Every structure is written in structure tokens, then in C-alpha cells.
Amino acid sequence: MAPTGKRTGESTRSTGPAPPSSAGYLDGRLLIAMPVMGDARFERSVIYLCAHSAEGAMGIIVNHPAGSIDFPELLEQLGIIRKGEHIKLPENAESMKVLRGGPVDTGRGFVLHSSDFYIENATLRIDDGVCLTATVDILRAIANGSGPKHAILALGYAGWAPGQLETEIQSNGWLHCDADADLIFGDDVDEKYGRALRKIGIDPGMLSNEAGHA
């Protein structure tokens, strides 16, 4: 799960509020893209940081729908359910959105979920309320109703080389704020960007390329 130090976009293998660590690391917090970011892949992105250290950073975009596929269709493609069996899925599975998690490893699924579900040697506990699992076992569990209470599925992730995220933050490319369950797992993905900004006292309508960083 941990980043391996390649630049964003390169292929690699790799809640309660979480304040920045004493070393300034932001894992467990949300990044909010600023207009000066200049990278269309991250425009108006809200990213939950799963890992951040001297080795780099890794996160999941939580507000950009994948658009081309829904969760029941993905389960069919993986052979977890047969065609037409979506009517038997639990309500939270049938309506679960598939998100575009970032430009790295876009063919791989990453599930951010509440900490009531855990697979030994497969689940990364990020903080007391949020975990990350990237195996098909969690998809099977969600499909049969034994999965976590809250979850989102993202295809791909965002990754940063050592020091890259810090440089982008210093250049006003990102703001950051406390994460909460609604901003991570909420269904209103189109509203998350504005809500994250308002959480740190910024009116989205007043945001400009000259905005400073918090």
C-alpha cells in the first residue's frame, strides 16, 4: 500500500480528525486542490491521504466518479455475481459509487472503508475510523452483506515522490483539512469540494488563482 517514490501519474506498486504529525505528515487528512494546481487530473479534487512520510505520499480521490462503470457491473466483470444478480445485492452495494481514485494503477481497485472490517495482512489501518483494503475479498464481503458499514471503491490512486507533495503545498497547490466520515464516504460527491473548502472557512465562490495556503 505504501508509495514507492515515483512521481504522480507514474505506475508503481505500492473517521476521526487526524492532525498533522509532529513531523508535519498529513496521512489521515484531506487534500483540497487549489486552482493553481495546473493539472487537469486533479482539478477540484479532494484526496484522502492514506500514507505520507519521508518516502513519499499516497492518497485516494474521493469526489471524482469513474463514470464508465458502476459497482454491480464491476462485480459481474470480476465473476463475484452473475449477470442480473444485482437485484440480490444489499442496498449499500447496489448503490455504491465507483470513483476515479487517481492516475496511478487505474486498473486496480482500492476500497476505503470504516474500521469495522479488517482482513489480516491485507487491510491497512490509517486511523481509528478509516482503513484501506485492495483485495477482491472485500468486494465479495460487500456483495454478500458482510462488508464494512461505510466504503467507497476507487480505481487507481494518487502518488507523490519524496518531498513532492510538500513542494506542491508550499507552492499553494493544495490546502488540507480534517477528514470526516461524510466527506470520505458520503454519496454527494459533487458537493465534497465545496464542503471541504467551507470546513476551513473558504467560500468556494471566492476562490481564485491568487488564494494562499492554510
UniProtKB/Swiss-Prot annotation:
NCBIfam families: PRK00228.1-4
Family to which this protein belongs: Belongs to the UPF0301 (AlgH) family.
SUPFAM superfamilies in the record: VC0467-like
Native organism taxonomy: Bacteria, Pseudomonadati, Pseudomonadota, Alphaproteobacteria, Hyphomicrobiales
Protein name (database record): UPF0301 protein blr1492
Region called Disordered, residue ranges: 1-22
Pfam family, one: DUF179
Organism: Bradyrhizobium diazoefficiens (strain JCM 10833 / BCRC 13528 / IAM 13628 / NBRC 14792 / USDA 110)
Any GO CC annotation of this UniProt entry: cytosol
